[in-house]
């Protein structure tokens, strides 16, 4: 069974982090960002991502509504209807279904924008100007030893605290960069959109892991 790990890499932005003396400016930026996104009932985003050393740039999109989400990227679709998670792999036309078990450390893509900052070591890095817009850059790193992530650097619009991009550096120094191309708040979406519908994938092989 071929495994894909992009979803987990994408969501490692909200892995378990430890507590250190914190940068108050970075903390205030995080608070403002979270206040913005937590007021939304739902949202949709399209993004590009790539790995340092590779010229390949891939595209993806995500729709989130509460704990429900649907992520399309890297030849796969991930559905979470709040009860179960279905990962569809296009190349092999198979879907893996497992129970959704939320926890404090759940790698829910909704938390890319609303992660709990408790336990994070966060610092303000710099302010930069791109295309006439001012952006604030903050960096988060884990206290817990042995995690796959070394640090996460997030770039936010200074004016409205929207996330522009983030860079994940793993323990081996490899970096993945994600850039938000379009963000739509409060999208109208039915709950059925987050459930895998077998009838729409003729001949799909179902691997029930529950």
Spans of features found by a protein language model:
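Solvent-exposed loop/turn segments connecting transmembrane beta-strands
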Residues: 52-55, 76, 173
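Gly/Pro-enriched, hydrophobic low-complexity segments
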Residues: 120-202, 206-209
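An acidic-aromatic
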Residues: 59-107, 176
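N-terminal leader/targeting segments and the immediate start of mature chains
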Residues: 17-55, 67-68, 200, 205-210
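Bacterial N-terminal signal peptides
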Residues: 8-16
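Flexible, surface-exposed loop/linker segments and immediately adjacent secondary-structure boundaries
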Residues: 100-134
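Short hydrophobic/aromatic-rich beta-strand segments that constitute the beta-sheet cores
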Residues: 45-47, 69-73, 85-88, 97, ...
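Bacterial N-terminal signal peptides that target proteins for export
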Residues: 1-7
């Amino acid at each position: 069974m071929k495994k894909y790990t992009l979803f987990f890499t994408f969501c490692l932005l909200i892995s378990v982090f430890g507590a250190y003396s914190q940068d108050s400016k970075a903390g205030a930026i995080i608070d403002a960002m979270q206040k913005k996104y937590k007021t939304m009932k739902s949202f949709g985003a399209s993004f590009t991502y790539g790995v340092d050393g590779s010229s390949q740039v891939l595209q993806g999109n995500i729709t989130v509504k509460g704990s429900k989400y649907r992520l399309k990227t890297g030849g796969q679709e991930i559905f979470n209807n709040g009860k179960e998670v279905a990962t569809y792999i296009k190349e092999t036309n198979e879907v893996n279904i497992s129970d959704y078990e939320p926890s404090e450390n759940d790698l829910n893509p909704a938390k890319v924008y609303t992660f709990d900052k408790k336990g994070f070591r966060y610092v303000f890095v710099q302010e930069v100007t791109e295309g006439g817009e001012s952006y604030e850059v903050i960096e988060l790193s884990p206290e817990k030893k042995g995690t796959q992530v070394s640090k996460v650097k997030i770039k936010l619009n200074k004016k409205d605290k929207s996330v522009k991009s983030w860079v994940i550096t793993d323990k081996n120094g490899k970096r993945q960069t994600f850039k938000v191309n379009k963000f739509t708040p409060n999208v109208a979406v039915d709950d059925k959109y987050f459930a895998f519908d077998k009838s729409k994938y003729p001949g799909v092989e179902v691997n029930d892991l529950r």
